[in-house]
Amino acid sequence: MTVPPVILIDILKRPSLLTSLSEQHQSAILTEARHVNLLGQLQYLCHQHDVFDDLFLHSQQTLLSGQQAHLAQCKQLNDYHNVLTQALTQATSTWSYINQAGIQFSQQQSRLGYLRQTTEILVSHNAIHHIENCLLTHGWRPKLISDYDEKSRIRYTNALSPFIHQESNLELVVHYQLLPKRFRYSNNDTFTRKLIYPDSCYPASIFDPISTIYHLAINLFFINDSKFGLRDIFTLYSLLNENSLQEGFWGELLTFQNKVGKDSSLFLALHFCHVLFDLAIPDFVSQYYHQQFKVSVTLNSLETSYIDLFSYAFPPYQDDDYKLAARLLRIRGCIKQMPLYLLLPHIIKRGIWNCLPHESEEELIC
């Protein structure tokens, strides 16, 4: 399929473009948005830029369905929180909702329309076995995983295998450390998060905006968890753009970067948010990152691959360049997460594993 001259990533940068498209082209954009879980956020964006009323009726109805899905998921998350609280309070006094669930529990405008795939929590390493037993006795069961990449990701990201709640089908991922095992501070990562305690998820906590931004950047650019790459980079842009209005935000961000050292995840997040969505970055922040990182070497090798990955994730647009970019970035993620002597066996095992027949995910969840 030939890629149209205007695709979703163009609309996210300039929502007004949507009003100049035919009804069929608008429908194609919204289909792409639904595929990458951005339909609800696009609806909010259209209202924010006063273009919603100028769209075709069918497009308005489709966008409203994304908003309704978001509202239903927020209500569902509150119900899930009650189920989790019942199970976890017997094993631990507190836990943190992280990544997608943490964003939905936050009170920021950037969460409006946001849809998550899984619910992830962070617990104390010392309580992990007690928590696992409590989940098993409260209607949870381990999820069978047939995808080798997902099995490897869990192995190298300090998480238990996901759990499925037998009644609600909630999928839960329990982390006992946040940073990947090969990361410099993986065994002592408490300085990478600052907790806040909204009433909506008591007695649990969520991360403050800078901690949330950093760990989203780690997932996208260190672990290379890019299945929903466009949604995640746009979420990073939304969080950065909204919080940049707060006095002292950029100074706090650079202080945070000094603590984590040479990891380039935040740098890459800022760069691609600027390139793709025109994020306004102060000169002193740009100068800092240009001094800290070998910008030309880092970006020349990554920029084209990441832009292809973010732009053409919709299956009809996936050409050979996209597939090559996805493969190269997956290998980059493997290299970052495991020693080199394990990389070749991993690639061989992945090829063999994914050629074998496995039960479908639908069969496993039912």
Regions found by a protein language model. Name each.
Residues 1-117, 123-366:
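Conserved NTP-donor binding/palm subdomain of two-metal-ion nucleotidyltransferases/polymerases, i.e.
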